[in-house]
Amino acid sequence: MLTLTRIHTVSYEVRSTFLFISVLEFAVGFLTNAFVFLVNFWDVVKRQPLSNSDCVLLCLSISRLFLHGLLFLSAIQLTHFQKLSEPLNHSYQAIIMLWMIANQANLWLAACLSLLYCSKLIRFSHTFLICLASWVSRKISQMLLGIILCSCICTVLCVWCFFSRPHFTVTTVLFMNNNTRLNWQIKDLNLFYSFLFCYLWSVPPFLLFLVSSGMLTVSLGRHMRTMKVYTRDSRDPSLEAHIKALKSLVSFFCFFVISSCAAFISVPLLILWRDKIGVMVCVGIMAACPSGHAAVLISGNAKLRRAVTTILLWAQSSLKVRADHKADSRTLC
C-alpha cells in the first residue's frame, strides 16, 4: 500500500537549486511586468491619453509585480525560515493571505480585459447588448478603480482579522493507516478556510471571464464564416484583432488554471503532509505562470512590441559603437 512520506527538511543542494530558480523566475517576471508598466506609465508622464486596454494592462502589471514579490518572499521563507515540522509562522501566513488577495485582483483585471475585448470587437445586434458594451467602454476606469479599492479593503480586513485574533494552538492527533500522525493546528485550519473563502470569491470574476471569452470565440467563428462567403482576402484587421485577443485570453486561462491547481495542491502539502519539496515545486509553478502571460501580452500588443524593438535596436547600436571604439583604440596603439 502506498503511503505519503513527509519531508520536513530538504538538503542544501535542493534548497540552493530552488532558491536559484526562484531568483530567476522573480527576475524574469519583474522585468517583463515592469516593462509593461513603464511603457504605459511613460505615456502618463508625457500626458498622452491611455486607451482602456492600456489602463487595464497598467493595473495588471502592478498586480503581477506584487504577485512575484510575494512568491519570492514565500520562497525565501521556505528555504530559510519556515520549518514544516513546526506550525506555520505568522509572516509566512501573512504572505500567503496577501498572495491570495493579489491573485484575486489579478483575476478581476483579466475579466475586465476580456469584457473590454468583447465591447470593442463583437458586433452586437440586440439593443441591450449594444448599450451594455457601450457602458463597459465608458466605465472601464471606474471598474479598475473599484477593483483597486476592493483589493485594498480586503487586504486591510484580512490582515486586521489575522493579527487581531488570539494565536493559541490546539493540537489534535489524527491516526491514519494506524501509524501516521498528523498534527492539525487551529491556525492552519483558519488559513485553510481563508484560502477556500478567497477562492469562492474568485468564482464570479472567473465566470465573467469565461462568458466573455466564449462570446468572443463565437464572434470569431461567425466572422470567419462571413469572410468565407463574402471575401477571399485573408488579411482582415477585425480577424487579426479577434485572434490576438483570443490568444491573450486563452493563454491567461491556461496559466490561471495551472497556477490554481498548483495552489490547491500546495495547501494539503503544506498543512497536512508537510512535504517541503512538493510545496517548493508548487511555488515554482505559480511563479512561472504570470511571467508567461506577460510575455504573451507583449507579443500581442503593437505598442509594447515597438518598445521592445526600440530597446533592441538601441542595445545593438550601443554594442556596435563600443566595438568600433575598441577597434579604433587598437589601431591607434
UniProtKB/Swiss-Prot annotation:
Signal peptide, first to last residue: none
Origin species: Pan troglodytes (Chimpanzee)
Role noted for this protein: Receptor that may play a role in the perception of bitterness and is gustducin-linked. May play a role in sensing the chemical composition of the gastrointestinal content. The activity of this receptor may stimulate alpha gustducin, mediate PLC-beta-2 activation and lead to the gating of TRPM5.
Pfam family membership, one: TAS2R
Membrane topology reported for the UniProt record: Multi-pass membrane protein
GO CC annotations, alphabetized: membrane; plasma membrane
Gene: TAS2R38
Keywords assigned by UniProt, alphabetized: G-protein coupled receptor, Glycoprotein, Membrane, Receptor, Sensory transduction, Taste, Transducer, Transmembrane, Transmembrane helix
Name the UniProt record assigns to this protein: Taste receptor type 2 member 38
GO biological process: detection of chemical stimulus involved in sensory perception of bitter taste
